């Protein structure tokens, strides 16, 4: 039995065998498919990690990244377009111009906006502007006079300002102010009556109406008082100038009133008019009010020594 088995083994060694040949393309294709599978898996895992990271990022960082990308995109587009244009220009120059005749020069300036100028860091920073701009082709051949708006009240053709004539022409304003004050006082009296007997839902509206009328009465009273005071001062100055004219006719030399004398004359005329309306008590009250105002002003301007804190003696 052993001899038979040895014979069979020796026969199998000498027997012809089939060669197992494998194409190299098949092996390389299988390797490439495996590499592609691994790369797709890696890219998908990378995308997942990026998405998870982006979802965890704050909105401020995302907005900043979007802003940076928007600034980078036009620059890259302009670079690509400039490269293409350069290639086209070189191709055209090689085809059109013969060697030895010289090359065409590019433009020194361009109307197209520049993308390499960065934006300002803040709105208070200075703006960067390109210096390569074309000179304007416009030329001023004929000088056109510029139209200036003028107020006809202050033209030399209107003449000088005459205060007496102005007061005569606009004397109706004082009467209008008095009539307006009388009407406003009547309306205020009526509004206060309505406020006293008004229901709760209309009370706030009527209070606002009363307040508005009170403010209007105060404004009109100040206008009427100013008109009366101006008239008193005008009459005082007119009386002084008339006396001076009569003295000059009698042979007195020229004399002009000083500012201090004028101020004293106007103060005296104001107090006389106040005494005519309210008596000596009103004049005394006005003088006390003026003195109090002056003393308060002096007190504010007075230098005070540094405050010393008193210590308690135990």
Curated annotation (Swiss-Prot):
Database matches in Pfam families: RRP36 (PF06102)
Feature: compositional bias, Acidic residues: 1-12, 76-93
Subcellular location: Nucleus, Nucleolus
Key word Nucleus present: yes
Keywords: Coiled coil, Nucleus, Ribonucleoprotein, Ribosome biogenesis, rRNA processing
Compositional bias (Basic and acidic residues): 94-119
Segments for region (Disordered): 1-136, 239-258, 274-314
Top-level division of the source organism's lineage: Eukaryota
Skewed-composition ranges (Basic residues): 290-314
GO BP annotations listed: maturation of SSU-rRNA from tricistronic rRNA transcript (SSU-rRNA, 5.8S rRNA, LSU-rRNA)
Compositionally biased spans, kind Polar residues: 46-56
Residue ranges of coiled coil: 173-224
The protein's assembly and partners: Associates with 90S and pre-40S pre-ribosomal particles.
Its job: Component of the 90S pre-ribosome involved in the maturation of rRNAs. Required for early cleavages of the pre-RNAs in the 40S ribosomal subunit maturation pathway.
Similarity comment: family membership: Belongs to the RRP36 family.
Protein name: rRNA biogenesis protein RRP36
Species of provenance: Laccaria bicolor (strain S238N-H82 / ATCC MYA-4686) (Bicoloured deceiver)
